[in-house]
Design a protein with these regions (language model features):
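Membrane-embedded beta-barrel scaffold of Gram-negative outer-membrane proteins
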Residues: 1-13, 45-52, 56
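Transmembrane beta-barrel architecture of outer-membrane proteins
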Residues: 13-15, 25-29, 51-57, 139-144, ...
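Conserved small-residue
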Residues: 19-25, 29, 36-138, 178, ...
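Membrane-embedded beta-strand positions of outer-membrane beta-barrel proteins
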Residues: 33, 47-49, 159, 258-260
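Transmembrane beta-strands of outer-membrane beta-barrel pores
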Residues: 35-37, 51-57, 152-154, 163-167, ...
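Repeated loop/turn-to-beta-strand initiation elements of outer-membrane beta-barrel proteins
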Residues: 41, 154-159, 246-247
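Extracytoplasmic gating/loop element in the C-terminal half of outer-membrane beta-barrel translocons
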Residues: 164-257
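Conserved small/polar residues in nucleotide/adenosyl-binding loops
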Residues: 268-275
Length: 280
């Protein structure tokens, strides 16, 4: 793969030079099956399903692009992992009591109602070098689709379902639904989830306390923002009617079909009701 590294502005327009990036191994498979049948009554239908999966991993990583592809820049790098791996902190709930704050590892900005991060190396401090790890992969486990078609006499119906299973998605809506301190406070609307934020009167909440300051750096890449990207969507539904040839022939039309269709009709995701299809 090629990579375009940043360059000093004084170099001018000729400073943008592509360099060789990592080497990657890709493997995948797709299966598509179709079944068609016609009944004596004149009812015809077909069912087509497909499923696909792919895996990739970085096999070689030149030193000059090592810091671009995640890891801590030392021993922990992306080699042997998927290209779209996510590197960050492991969120461990929020501080709900002063005792939890006092007995936790050193963490700049910690306090009641703030996100707590795991001390992965056990040294009693939350640091960028030793307390980040590989926390997810945005690639789905597999994708699938289902196409249903049926017709009876002059009426036809078609439905197309499409879905994704697995894969971690960065839910940017959380920046507005759970926080007041990591977006523009004065000029940005926020979702009503902020009304359920932690407070001494609401001590069981898992949403960070409202604040106009971000001393705990809570916009950092962490598992707090990662959600399961699985979904199933009814992409298209179409109902049509083909006019009899005897009717349209008088108007010198060989074939006339009228139809109504709708797109993105139904969506199923779990546990969040948000549509993660646009986040991929």
């Amino acid at each position: 793969m090629l990579y375009l590294p940043p360059y000093i502005g004084a170099f001018g327009e000729g400073g943008d030079t592509y360099v060789n990036g990592p080497s990657m191994e890709n493997r995948g498979v797709e299966i598509l099956l179709t079944y068609r049948n016609s009944l004596p009554s004149g009812f015809n239908y077909s069912i087509t399903g497909n499923i696909a999966t792919f895996k990739n991993k970085i096999t070689e990583l030149p030193d000059n692009v090592r810091s671009v592809y995640g890891g801590n820049g030392m021993l922990d790098d992306i080699i042997g992992r998927p290209r779209n791996s996510i590197y960050g902190y492991v969120a461990d709930g929020i501080f709900k009591t002063q005792e939890e704050v006092d007995n936790s590892p050193q963490q700049a900005g910690k306090g009641l109602g703030r996100i707590r991060y795991k001390d992965l190396d056990g040294d009693g401090r939350i640091t960028q070098d030793y307390d980040r790890t590989w926390i997810g992969v945005s690639d789905p486990d597999f994708t699938y689709g289902l196409n249903l078609q049926a017709s009876y006499k002059n009426v036809d119906l078609a439905l197309f379902f499409q879905g994704v299973h697995g894969g971690d998605v960065w839910d940017s809506w959380i920046e507005y639904s759970d926080f007041w301190n990591i977006q523009n406070v004065n000029n940005t609307n926020h979702l009503k989830g902020v009304f359920n934020a932690w407070s001494p009167q609401n001590p069981d909440s898992n949403i960070p306390a409202l604040s106009t300051r971000n001393t705990n750096d809570e916009k950092r890449t962490s598992t707090y923002f990662l959600k399961d990207g699985s979904y199933l969507k009814l992409r298209t539904i179409e109902l049509g009617y083909t006019f009899p040839e005897s009717m349209v022939k008088k108007a010198m039309i060989s074939r006339l079909r009228a139809y109504v269709s709708a797109n993105n009709c139904l969506l199923y995701t779990s546990p969040s009701p948000r549509d993660y299809a646009a986040s991929r």
